[in-house]
UniProtKB/Swiss-Prot annotation:
Homodimer or homooligomer; disulfide-linked. Highly glycosylated atypical beta-defensin involved in several aspects of sperm function. Facilitates sperm transport in the female reproductive tract and contributes to sperm protection against immunodetection; both functions are probably implicating the negative surface charge provided by its O-linked oligosaccharides in the sperm glycocalyx. Involved in binding of sperm to oviductal epithelial cells to form a sperm reservoir until ovulation. Disulfide bonds join C27-C58, C34-C52, C38-C59. One of its GO terms (cellular component) is extracellular region. It comes from the Eukaryota. It is found in: Secreted. Residues 1-20 form the signal peptide. The gene is DEFB126. GO terms for biological process: defense response to Gram-negative bacterium; single fertilization. InterPro entries: Beta-defensin. This is Beta-defensin 126.
Amino acid sequence: MKSLLFTLAVFMLLAQLVSGSWYVKKCLNDVGICKKKCKPEELHVKNGWAMCGKQRDCCVPADKRANYPAFCVQTKTTRTSTVTATTATRATTATTTTLMMTTASMSSMTPTPVSPTG
């Protein structure tokens, strides 16, 4: 019985020491994962440094981004075609579209009084 308790105590101690690398910091209400660099299919969350620190980005997997579309920055790809006399070339440019409203655009909106009589 003593050896069983000793084995259990050693196992619990080792689990506490080893589990430090198993912990992954989450962000955006446990939807995103804090990483040094996001994968191409993941979305980068704007202002993720507030949740993950200055050296890490908050990356939202593609399957979970529909839950929080207002916080994510999506990369939109536009295709342009240029045709010359002998060859056809196609150039792809990537632009970043921010879906989150900035404080500057919010401050420009001023409320207007509305009368109840019309």
